[in-house]
Design a protein with these regions (language model features):
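Residue-level detector of alpha-helix initiation sites
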Residues: 73-76
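Rhodanese-like catalytic fold shared by cysteine-dependent sulfurtransferases
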Residues: 1-29, 36-67, 78-120
């Protein structure tokens, strides 16, 4: 049974907020898959924004051969995005706990206009 479960729900690498920030600083793409209103309220500096529902059509917008760190508010939508990207052969890591964990770690959150943001 565990073999079937691992094939149905393969584990994706996960990162803490601090690890994700370090990967981003080393050149990984931090991909925020939340909706537009969530993004505008607050996101990680330097993140790219492609809502989960648009990701299948926009995967080509992501540079190949770069690690992608997926993030949403809590980690669930980003896990779906990570699975989708992994099926396409991308090197992908899911930010465990999402933007909630990012903010709890004291990492910066900026609003759509560039000022201080909040996780929505």
């Amino acid at each position: 049974m565990s073999g079937l479960l691992s094939r149905l729900f393969p584990q994706r690498p996960k990162a803490t907020a601090e690890q994700a920030r370090q990967l981003q600083q080393q050149g990984a793409i931090l991909l925020d898959v939340r909706e537009d209103t969530e993004w505008r309220a607050g996101h990680a500096p330097g993140a790219r924004h492609i809502p989960l529902r648009r990701l299948p059509a926009r995967m080509k917008d992501l540079p190949p051969r770069r690690t992608v760190i997926t993030v949403c508010r809590s980690g669930h939508r980003s896990a779906q995005a990570a699975a989708l990207l992994a099926r396409e052969g991308r090197d992908v890591v899911n930010l465990s706990g999402g933007m909630n964990a990012w903010a709890r770690a004291g990492l910066p959150v900026v609003a759509g206009g560039g000022g201080p943001g909040r996780v929505a």
